[in-house]
């Protein structure tokens, strides 16, 4: 994890990539959460599911059976971990066989995009049109290929899918100025987040402090950054809990909620908030990646109801570009929003304010369209940008080369 700006850290926190640098490993062994389990630990190995209650391995079928009485099943993810999304798809499929009255809640989409999700579940849209009209690459920063199996299953079985998130600009306002700064209409969309839960605050602070911070963030600036981050993280959790409950009012069965693990750890995030409001039973599954040089890692038994160990990947299946773009009034071309600090673009010659004239000879004036184009590149490919910088046209090569032991890069 790393911290460049509060919003960047917020994106990182929403997924919490479960690999085990020393400064991050302690996140998994905190004595918080379930009072009966928080002082106990268990050793987790790859390709094995563990029951926190029992402190030992559990067969997949038994785990699914134990979920029968739950109304919410929360399955955490690292957004660019293909194995974790395969696990999500497997759980959804098994729960569907158990009870076909099933729906899926998504961190990936804001509630304002519900109509496009309805059309997808009804089988009206082909995939390419869904990605385009649903603005997948504007709402979400990750390759649709990670989620393809999940979405295709939902479409085939006509499973209702619900966007649970708030529009990003509202979360940014809360981060900078607090919930009170929202308009009356905006407050109706984003419920006021409870900031008083000390164990949740301790969890987010531990994740925050495990991030490599630049020197200028030390001292008073560090505390201000954390408070803004915590407001935003809490608002995200509160909003997703609110809309998950609202969606389930329309459904008689259970809902599988797919969200970054940072929203679910120790059952203190959106899962806790939804339970406190409804008392509806739930289960949480969190995956942890086991490094190649370790047989097991030690985690707190209060981390989640089920902990699923998976082998650490050498690199993500799909390259992360790391470029953000914006539109400027009066200019048709897209503009590089900030100098890239991660993804394959980090090592390219891109600068904030570069005007994108073309990519591989093609002009783009829509952010989603450019991201759709870039999403088709594989490792070792190369895209050629022509940008305008200081009134000079410059060729910039975007090389899709993985770093050694590349971790998640939002």
Residue ranges and their predicted role:
Residues 351, 357, 372-410:
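PDZ-domain C-terminal substructure recognizer with occasional recognition of PDZ-binding tails
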Residues 12-19:
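Hydrophobic h-region of N-terminal signal peptides that target proteins for export
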Residues 297-341, 376, 395-410:
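PDZ/PDZ-like peptide-tail recognition elements
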Residues 345-367:
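Conserved PDZ fold ligand-binding element
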Residues 98, 102-103, 115-245, 249:
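A substrate-binding/cap region within the structured catalytic cores of diverse enzymes
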Residues 20-70:
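N- or domain-start disorder-to-order transition segments that initiate the globular core
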Residues 55-96:
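Zymogen propeptides
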Residues 79-105, 111-122:
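Membrane-embedded segments
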């Amino acid at each position: 994890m790393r911290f460049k700006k509060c919003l960047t850290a917020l994106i990182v926190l929403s997924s919490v990539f479960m690999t085990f640098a020393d400064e991050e490993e302690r996140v998994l062994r905190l004595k918080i959460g379930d009072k009966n389990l928080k002082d106990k630990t268990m050793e987790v190995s790859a390709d094995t599911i563990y029951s926190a209650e029992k402190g030992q391995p559990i067969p997949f079928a038994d785990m699914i059976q134990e979920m029968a009485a739950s109304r919410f099943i929360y399955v955490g993810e690292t957004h660019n971990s293909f194995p974790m999304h395969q696990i999500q798809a497997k759980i959804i499929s098994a729960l569907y066989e158990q009870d076909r009255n099933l729906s899926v809640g998504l961190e990936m989409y804001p509630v304002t995009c519900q109509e496009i999700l309805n059309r997808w579940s009804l089988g009206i849209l082909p995939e390419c049109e869904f990605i385009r009209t649903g603005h997948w690459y504007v709402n979400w920063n990750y390759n649709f290929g990670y989620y393809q199996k999940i979405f295709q299953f939902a479409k085939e079985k006509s499973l209702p899918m619900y966007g649970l998130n708030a529009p990003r600009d509202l979360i940014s306002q809360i981060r900078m100025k607090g919930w009170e700064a929202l308009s009356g209409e905006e407050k109706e969309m984003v419920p006021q987040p409870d900031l008083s839960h000390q164990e949740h605050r301790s969890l987010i602070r531990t994740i925050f402090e495990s991030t490599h911070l630049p020197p200028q963030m030390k001292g008073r600036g560090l505390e201000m950054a954390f408070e803004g981050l915590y407001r935003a993280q809490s608002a995200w959790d509160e909003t997703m809990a609110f809309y998950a409950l609202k969606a389930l009012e329309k459904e008689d069965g259970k809902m599988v909620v797919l969200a970054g693990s940072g929203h679910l750890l120790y059952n203190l995030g959106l899962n806790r908030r939804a339970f406190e409001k409804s008392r509806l039973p739930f289960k949480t599954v969190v995956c942890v990646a086991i490094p190649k040089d370790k047989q097991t890692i030690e985690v707190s038994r209060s981390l989640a109801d089920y902990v699923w160990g998976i082998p650490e990947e050498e690199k993500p299946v799909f390259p992360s570009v790391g470029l953000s773009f914006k539109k400027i009034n009066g200019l048709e071309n897209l503009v590089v929003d900030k100098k890239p600090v991660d993804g394959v673009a980090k090592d390219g010659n891109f600068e904030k304010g570069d005007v994108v004239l073309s990519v591989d000879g093609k002009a783009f004036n829509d952010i989603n369209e450019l991201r759709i184009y870039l999403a088709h590149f594989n490792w070792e490919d190369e895209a050629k940008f022509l940008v305008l910088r200081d009134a000079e046209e410059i060729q910039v090569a975007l090389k899709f080369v993985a770093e050694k032991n590349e971790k998640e890069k939002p």
